[in-house]
Amino acid sequence: MNERTNVGYKIIKVVALPHVEFVLGEKTTDSGTKYVTWRCNNHTDYYYGHYIENFDAAMLDLYERVQDEVIFIISQLKEKTK
């Protein structure tokens, strides 16, 4: 797979769910390394970015976003089975 980037951020982590991905981007500049997590559709449509200064905080944000989405998916499935 080709290296993915968005607005100068290299995508370094991808968590794919059935209809959406959450990604972690990294960008190194003269002032240091910056991180962002995005929601992503179709490997190219990045939105709802959370911009973060620290790698560990960015990883936590990524996994919290994934967790929130999984909880939402589960609630939708439970509603369908009622």
Q: Where are the model-predicted features located?
A:
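Generic detector of short alpha-helix boundary/capping microenvironments
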Residues: K13, D45-Y47, I71
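General helical secondary-structure elements
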Residues: N6-Y9, V23, Y35, D61
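Short acidic DE-rich linear segments
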Residues: S75-K82
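Negatively charged, low-complexity tracts enriched in Asp/Glu with abundant Ser/Thr
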Residues: M1-A16
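A short, charged, amphipathic alpha-helix used as a generic interaction element across diverse proteins
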Residues: Y51-V70
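Short aromatic-glycine-(Arg/Gly/Cys) micro-motifs in beta-strand/loop hairpins
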Residues: V20-G49, R65
